[in-house]
């Protein structure tokens, strides 16, 4: 065993050890702050009910979502969006029909909530040649709203393609002009990543700061947003402490020191998928799974021999501890930690929902390991897959189907065996999100992974397929991400076979990947830099209150 030649990825150690995580403390879980938040929510409800103009309503909905407090006011939001939808569809008189901002904001919010609204509502802003009118260039607020709305497009919607190109071009031009700093910051933030591609909770510190600088800022909404953020942060800290205690008991960080120790970064994935308080179980499940996936991925990618990997894959596929004796010691530790964690979590699930998820959970772990083994065989044989062949495996090895199928189990009240089995085919609701996660991951990690000697990723596969250079290929992959979002908008957002909670979580999976790998770096694997800033902002540092 000791004489076996093994590769090393030289991963940096975690900067979030158990001692530090257990020391996290927040006063915002105290009863006085919870009572204050309830009082503020009642005052906001009164404010919302006093609002009469449809445009004021949709702007309030937008603000509530950006400030990540919309989950407190779902009844109000649902009622008012239905009213706006009825106005647009029935052709009833609306005083804002010529208002680009009002029309595009309504379109975006309605589509975001699953309403099927035609892009024809934008015809009023186009000339006889089918182009957007040039006089719209000076309407910066309208341009920003048009830009954000254009990312709700689906395949074949040429009006929306034109809207996106038009708005992007003119917003970039506006940035070069001498303009108000707050407005310039808002444009730059939008051009960096559109709102539809962001998770509101992961972006909320920026949104709160931006809202506070607005001239039309409502102090009541701002106060609630800050307090709600701090209360949620207190809850997230408690969850991380619980996760850290679990992780310490597994002894995986010290026993498998060659692998990534990324508990906190894994928790960010769970937080991004489902940030609301009532989705705690989902967050914890995703965090535990992602932590274990990172370790197992490193076993297959870097440390394990091909013979060992075949034995480990077989043990996971059989889901039986009698195969433990066949494994080397480091794999025994990993397999038993996986086996116990999944079974304990499934026991809690059985008590809560009366449903045995072990067969479905173990299936996804086996599927993941079998795919890792295929990719390991590619590496050891020197095989170079085409981009399509790579993505067919890569959508599984990035663990999208694993995370989304478990999220479905958590978010579905009345579980049916048939529906869960249907998910095993990785239908579009899972496929497109997983492909997007794979592409975003590869943009951020492929350079470092190739230095370690890992398999070629999507960038290298496309370069090998086409002869393009890396810069051209990165541009191609970014365009592929855009076209994949069109599929997500149709096959996930508008797929009414699934609950809105699950559809939102699925899209959040795509969004978190772009958050983690936003700057073409590895926000999951590299603990310093942007990753550290994000953890501090979301989980460690509260927003100062007066």
Curated annotation (Swiss-Prot):
Binding of Mg(2+) 1, residues: 297, 301
Keyword Magnesium: yes
BP term (GO), one: (+)-epi-alpha-bisabolol biosynthetic process
Gene3D superfamilies (UniProt xref): Farnesyl Diphosphate Synthase, Terpene synthase, N-terminal domain
GO MF term set: magnesium ion binding; sesquiterpene synthase activity
Disulfide bond listed as a keyword: no
Catalytic class of the enzyme: lyase
Co-factor requirement: Mg(2+)
Cofactor note: Binds 3 Mg(2+) ions per subunit.
Pathway(s) served: Secondary metabolite biosynthesis; terpenoid biosynthesis
Reactions that this protein is recorded to catalyse: (2E,6E)-farnesyl diphosphate + H2O = (+)-epi-alpha-bisabolol + diphosphate
Family, per entry: Belongs to the terpene synthase family.
Biological role: Sesquiterpene synthase involved in the biosynthesis of (+)-epi-alpha-bisabolol, a precursor of the natural sweetner hernandulcin.
Domain notes: The Asp-Asp-Xaa-Xaa-Asp/Glu (DDXXD/E) motif is important for the catalytic activity, presumably through binding to Mg(2+).
Designated name of the protein: (+)-epi-alpha-bisabolol synthase
């Amino acid at each position: 065993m000791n004489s076996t030649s093994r590769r090393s990825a030289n991963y940096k150690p975690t900067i979030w050890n158990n001692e530090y995580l257990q020391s996290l403390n927040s006063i915002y879980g105290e009863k006085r702050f919870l009572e204050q938040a309830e009082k503020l929510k009642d005052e906001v409800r009164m404010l919302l009910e006093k609002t009469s103009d449809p445009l004021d309503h949709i702007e309030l909905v937008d603000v509530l979502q950006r400030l990540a407090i919309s989950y407190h006011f779902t009844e109000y939001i649902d009622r008012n969006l239905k009213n706006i939808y009825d106005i647009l569809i029935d052709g009833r008189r609306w005083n804002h029909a010529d208002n680009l901002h009002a029309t595009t904001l309504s379109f975006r919010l309605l589509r975001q909530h699953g309403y099927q609204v035609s892009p024809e509502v934008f015809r009023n802003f186009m000339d006889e040649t089918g182009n957007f009118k040039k006089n719209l260039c000076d309407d910066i607020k309208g341009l920003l709203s048009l830009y954000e709305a254009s990312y709700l497009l689906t395949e074949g919607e040429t009006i929306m393609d034109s809207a996106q190109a038009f708005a992007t071009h003119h917003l970039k031009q506006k940035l070069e002009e001498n303009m108000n700093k707050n407005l310039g910051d808002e444009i730059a933030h939008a051009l960096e990543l559109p709102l539809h591609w962001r998770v509101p909770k992961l972006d909320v510190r920026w949104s709160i700061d931006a809202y506070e600088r607005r001239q039309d800022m409502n102090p009541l909404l701002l106060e609630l947003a800050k307090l709600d953020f701090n209360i949620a942060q207190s809850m997230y800290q408690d969850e991380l402490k619980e996760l850290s205690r679990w992780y310490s008991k597994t002894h995986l960080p010290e026993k498998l020191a060659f692998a990534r120790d990324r508990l906190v970064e894994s928790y960010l994935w769970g937080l991004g998928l489902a940030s609301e308080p009532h989705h705690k179980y989902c967050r914890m499940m995703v965090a535990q799974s992602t932590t274990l996936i990172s370790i197992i991925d490193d076993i297959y990618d870097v440390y394990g021999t091909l013979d060992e990997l075949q034995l480990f894959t077989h043990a996971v596929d059989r889901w039986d501890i009698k195969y433990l004796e066949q494994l080397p010691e480091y794999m025994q530790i990993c397999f038993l930690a996986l086996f116990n964690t999944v079974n304990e979590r499934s026991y809690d699930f059985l008590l809560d929902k009366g449903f045995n998820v072990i067969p479905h959970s173990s299936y996804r772990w086996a599927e993941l390991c079998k795919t890792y083994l295929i990719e390991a065989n590619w590496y050891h044989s020197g095989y170079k897959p085409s981009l399509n062949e790579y993505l067919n495996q890569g959508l599984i090895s990035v663990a999208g189907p694993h995370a989304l199928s478990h999220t479905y189990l958590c978010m579905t009240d009345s579980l049916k065996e048939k529906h869960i089995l249907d998910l095993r085919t990785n239908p579009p609701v899972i496929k497109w999100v997983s492909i997007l996660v794979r592409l975003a991951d590869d943009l951020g990690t492929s350079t470092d992974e190739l230095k370690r000697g890992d398999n070629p990723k999507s960038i290298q596969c496309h370069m090998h397929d086409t002869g393009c250079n890396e810069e051209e290929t990165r541009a191609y992959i970014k365009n592929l991400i855009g076209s994949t979002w069109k599929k997500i908008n149709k096959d996930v957002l508008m797929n009414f076979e699934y609950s809105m909670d699950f559809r939102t979580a699925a899209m959040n999976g795509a969004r978190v990947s772009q958050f983690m790998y936003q700057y073409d770096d590895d926000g999951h694997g590299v603990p310093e830099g942007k990753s550290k800033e994000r953890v501090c902002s979301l989980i460690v540092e509260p927003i100062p209150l007066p």
